[in-house]
Amino acid sequence: MSEQQYTLPDLLQNWPWNRHLSPYYEEAKRESSAWVESFKPFDQDGQRAFDAYLLASLTYSHGSREFVRLGCDLMNFYFVYDEYTDVSDSAVADRLANIVIDAMRNPENSSQSGDHLLGKMTKHFWTRALAMAPAGSPCFEHFITTSETYLRAVTQEAEDRANKRVRKVDDYLRLRRDTCGARPTLALIEFGLNLPNEVVRHPSLVALTEAAVDLIILVNDMHSYVRELSCGHENHNLITAIMLEHRLNRQDAFHWLGSHCSRVVDQFLSDLDELPSWGEPTDSGVRDYINGLGQWVRGNDDWSTESKRYYGEDGETIRQERLVTTRSGESNYIKFGQVGVQDSVRIQPIEAN
């Protein structure tokens, strides 16, 4: 059995936001757990390993109890949706996207979602989300449009997976910015902040948001690589793209990732210093939004080692020592059956139109 060790770079060593766990973690976990289990999407071991509740409570950690609960539901939904599309071809993935989009745009009278569990989950989630801001708030349409882009991009990812396509770094990042779901995830931060459209769409704020999206991708692809390698899904990972395009070995690819991430962090902090003022109360909402971005980036990294999703019981050791071992021919740290991937997904058929 061949083994290889490599060192993980500390991607966020200069990130000014610190770990913060929501005080509503246990309460939101209890409520959201009961909610997602009521749909019975797959076995509970997969949900425990993913731990959507910890992810939401580390990333939306300064929000109200209702907001943290909403974040838990969103993370749970993404997990279920990703697991379904991971075992779907592009045609099925596209139909699943239609179900979800229709349920958000027409929660009271959705013709396409029917009784499919993804449609039901979307309606339940969106009904609660609509209560988080005044009717007609721009945040609702922003969330829907970014969600639609994400759902359509996942269909493209399914095609890449079927064709065993490996993209170059820039091309990969363009697609990954949509397939990772970070844009709608960060759009949720806007709920209740009453930020006008012209502020949210200002080039300075857009640049900060896009940098946060990239940092989420870089952190996620670093931590998920071992698991994806053992599962045969490493073609849709930035490390693979770096290795192939730049002809680097695995360790040097991680060094490249670390250097690239440092540049993104530096640019984020530089752009933050140049942010214009819109006057109060808008500036207060902008500060809350930016702190939400910063906490999401930090919390995503914290969750990656604190949950069992990527490293099983070894997360804390890996966080401290930064040393990871890959073993060819076997799952690393956790197996498919432990994380609810593929073999534990019971795909609900989609009714023909």
Curated annotation (Swiss-Prot):
A motif (DDXXD motif) lies at residues 82-86. Gene3D superfamilies: Farnesyl Diphosphate Synthase. Mg(2+) 1 binds at D82. GO terms for biological process: isoprenoid biosynthetic process. Signal peptide: none annotated. Its EC number is 4.2.3.-, 4.2.3.126, 4.2.3.198. (2E,6E)-farnesyl diphosphate binds at R309, Y310. Mg(2+) 3 binds at N220, S224, E228. Mg(2+) 2 binds at D82. One of its GO terms (molecular function) is terpene synthase activity. The record marks F79 as: Plays a critical role in the stabilization of intermediate cation. SUPFAM superfamilies: Terpenoid synthases. It catalyses: (2E,6E)-farnesyl diphosphate = gamma-muurolene + diphosphate; (2E,6E)-farnesyl diphosphate = alpha-selinene + diphosphate; (2E,6E)-farnesyl diphosphate = delta-cadinene + diphosphate. Its cofactor is Mg(2+). It comes from the Eukaryota. InterPro entries: Isoprenoid_synthase_dom_sf, Terpene_cyclase-like_2. Keywords: Lyase, Magnesium, Metal-binding. Belongs to the terpene synthase family. Terpene cyclase that catalyzes the cyclization of farnesyl diphosphate (FPP) to various sesquiterpenes, including beta-elemene, gamma-muurolene, alpha-selinene, beta-selinene, beta-cadinene, delta-cadinene and alpha-cadinol. The DDXXD motif is important for the catalytic activity, presumably through binding to Mg(2+). This is Sesquiterpene synthase Agr8. It comes from Cyclocybe aegerita (Black poplar mushroom).
